[in-house]
Each structure stands twice: as structure tokens, then as C-alpha cells.
């Protein structure tokens, strides 16, 4: 895996763990973990989206804010790498 992707994945994992902790959810999170399955609510997802934007200094385009893109750390990683690579945001 490329260093940038590893860095993005680690940062996303950190943000996800922070949101889970703030929502009193204790879970072992892996890149493929389905966040809804480990207990993240829709409000938690909104919080996660905002924290991801802040962490990566991005404004996600509306079309990227989908359940599929926030399904797992891996899905968010792909979306973020795409945004960083496209120079948008």
C-alpha cells in the first residue's frame, strides 16, 4: 500500500475511533468494519463526516456524501484519496 494511502487510512481510523468513543461505543474497528454494524447512528455518521472534513481540510461535494462512502474506513479512505487526488475541496 502506498504511504499516502496508509496515512489516510490511519487518520480515518483515528477519527472513527474518536467518534465511537464520543458516542460511548466500544468496538474493535478495522478498515473493512461496517460502521453501522458496530453501532454508529445516523447522527454519528454526520459527526464523522464533519470530523473527516476537518481532519483532511476538505469540503466534501454533496455527491460524495453517501452511505456507501461512509460504510467503512476503507470506503472513506477511497473517497478521501479521490478527493485529495482530484484537487477539489
Curated annotation (Swiss-Prot):
Gene3D superfamilies on file: ACP-like
Keyword Phosphoprotein recorded: yes
Phosphoprotein recorded as keyword: yes
Alphabetized InterPro entries for the sequence: ACP-like_sf, PP-bd_ACP
Signal peptide extent: none
O-(pantetheine 4'-phosphoryl)serine: residues bearing it: 42
Keyword tags: Phosphopantetheine, Phosphoprotein
Posttranslational mods: 4'-phosphopantetheine is transferred from CoA to a specific serine of the apo-form of this carrier protein.
Highest taxon in the source lineage: Bacteria
GO BP annotation list: lipid A biosynthetic process
Role according to the record: Aminoacyl carrier protein. Can be charged with L-glycine via the formation of a thioester bond between the amino acid and the 4'-phosphopantetheinyl prosthetic group, catalyzed by the bll6282 ligase.
Protein name: Aminoacyl carrier protein 2
